[in-house]
Amino acid sequence: MGVPAVPEASSPRWGTLLLAIFLAASRGLVAAFKVTTPYSLYVCPEGQNATLTCRILGPVSKGHDVTIYKTWYLSSRGEVQMCKEHRPIRNFTLQHLQHHGSHLKANASHDQPQKHGLELASDHHGNFSITLRNVTPRDSGLYCCLVIELKNHHPEQRFYGSMELQVQAGKGSGSTCMASNEQDSDSITAAALATGACIVGILCLPLILLLVYKQRQVASHRRAQELVRMDSNTQGIENPGFETTPPFQGMPEAKTRPPLSYVAQRQPSESGRYLLSDPSTPLSPPGPGDVFFPSLDPVPDSPNSEAI
């Protein structure tokens, strides 16, 4: 009631549209590829040959209207993006170092690169490389490989790959080139730093525990001194009055008593002497015949004792 029915004819239309979108997206995903570098760092001694390699992963579009260009150039490491700057390798421009499909482009003959100690190679597995012969420290830098897919002379996809070449001068630098990944070296460095931090922490743990123990001892000693001082202050108060406390419900409020005060006074005795004298007052001298104990009258003899 009140809900319009959806026409059945719209369902096939939506299904056809979704199927077309899915096929277009899947076709784009299948046609996508990327460029990778097996090694990101090459270390070569001076005078050796350095071969830098890039690799295309994924299916590449095929057809008469599709052209794949692969080229090499020098660049620098940027803060945001690498391989943005284009510089020629040994005075060779970008057009001179281009591949066309799996073969070299027609305008880049083998004689021109070889005259400058360069050699380009490519295979059917997506690998393409450049070889620098008799390298010198001037050849050190960041090398980039660029792959461009053109359809009807319009660029469709553009991918980069980068690697660094370090040329070591001197006779003791070795005899062969070494290739490695910077990620591996970074992971090794991170593991070494973590291990060193653990060792330092274990060595510093006893010192930290000792400092904590000393601090607790000082705190306990200070607390004991405060308790002793409070106790001595409490004992120094003589005859304090009762503290007023709030009365409980149903009980009369206790009245506070004033502190007791007592003044010593002298009280005369029967003999005329003072039983209690003020401080620093000598006792009165005894009278003649007075002794401490009162004299007793003699007891008369009983008649019974005389008869005996």
UniProtKB/Swiss-Prot annotation:
Its main location: membrane. Disruption phenotype: Viable and fertile. At birth, lymphocyte populations in bone marrow, spleen and lymph nodes appear to be normal. Frequencies of activated peripheral T-cells are increased in older animals. Levels of the inflammatory cytokines CCL11, CXCL10, CCL2 and CXCL9 are significantly increased. Tissues show signs of chronic inflammation, however this does not progress to overt autoimmune disease. GO terms for cellular component: external side of plasma membrane; plasma membrane. Residues 1-32 form the signal peptide. The keyword Glycoprotein applies. Pfam families: V-set. PROSITE patterns: IG_LIKE (PS50835). Expressed in spleen, thymus, bone marrow, lymph node, and in T-cells within the lamina propria of the small intestine. Detected on CD4+ and CD8+ T-cells, bone marrow-derived dendritic cells (BMDCs), peritoneal macrophages, neutrophils, and natural killer (NK) cells. In spleen and lymph nodes, highly expressed on CD4+ T-cell populations, and at lower levels on CD8+ T-cells. In thymus, has low expression on CD4+ cells and CD8+ cells, and not detected on CD4+CD8+ cells. Expressed in splenic and peritoneal CD11b cells. Not detected in most B cells and NK cells (at protein level). Residues 33-191 are extracellular. Residues 33-167 form the Ig-like V-type domain. InterPro entries: Ig-like_dom, Ig-like_dom_sf, Ig-like_fold, Ig_sub, Ig_V-set, VISTA. Coiled coil: none annotated. The modification Phosphoserine is found at S232. It is a single-pass type I membrane protein. Keywords: Cell membrane, Disulfide bond, Glycoprotein, Immunoglobulin domain, Membrane, Phosphoprotein, Receptor, Signal, Transmembrane, Transmembrane helix. PANTHER family: V-TYPE IMMUNOGLOBULIN DOMAIN-CONTAINING SUPPRESSOR OF T-CELL ACTIVATION (PTHR44819:SF1). Immunoregulatory receptor which inhibits the T-cell response. May promote differentiation of embryonic stem cells, by inhibiting BMP4 signaling. May stimulate MMP14-mediated MMP2 activation. This is V-type immunoglobulin domain-containing suppressor of T-cell activation. It comes from Mus musculus. The lineage of its organism: Eukaryota, Metazoa, Chordata, Craniata, Vertebrata.
